[in-house]
Amino acid sequence: ETALHPEHYQTTYQYAVGLNASKPWGNETPQSTCCGGTGSENHVKYQEATYFVSDNTLWVALYMPTTLHWEEKNITLQQECLWPAKSSTIKVTAGEARFAMKLRVPYWATDGFDVKLNGISIATHYQPCSYAVIPTRQWKENDIVEITMPFTKHIDYGPDKLPAEIASKDGHQLETAWVGTLMHGPFAMTATDITNWTEATLNIDSRLASITVVEPNGPQTGTTGNLYTLMQGGRTFQPDYYRHDHTTHYFRI
């Protein structure tokens, strides 16, 4: 993961998934260094992977504020949304053209995902990890596509169990256990208060009913904009992209 330090001109490329892992930050020069990671350019390249086109099909792969000028079709579309995006709109702002549109259904969009064309849902069911299809039609100025994609809670499990000898390295005897990351939509959620493996345990049911979502109530933009939080008992979980200090995001389950 490439991230920027909130207070300094520093970047991080990757860091361990282990207990109480903290992001290692590179130097404070604008150039940074290759040994600190080669992904610093990622943030200005997302737009290159937002849309793809063939002769008569437009694929929408990412949901982010962008403007698409499709020269071959002489048409312009503008996408608007907040980030993180639980909804987005795509509007034809200039031109007319005939084509099909395919919109990505994220893997985590298992409940409540919907696509509306000019106010009417295009389907009653959407398959995660696929594309929702608006068949070939004549698009014109002011046509609007609305995408709704509520974040869902789920666990991203590791490929195998955490051995007891590893789990017990901090002096506590722990049994072999499955491990994984608590997810909210596309975001890995980190606990803000965990310092040893005995605390890094999630006691959950299959529906994650004990975990509640705290909707953002602060600013919608900026460093803390649109910040979603999860709670379990007295424990707080925040998105990993937001945390720059203690960032335990790997739990015994």
Model-derived segments and spans:
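Extended Gly/Ser/Thr-rich low-complexity repeat segments
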Residues: 102, 146-149
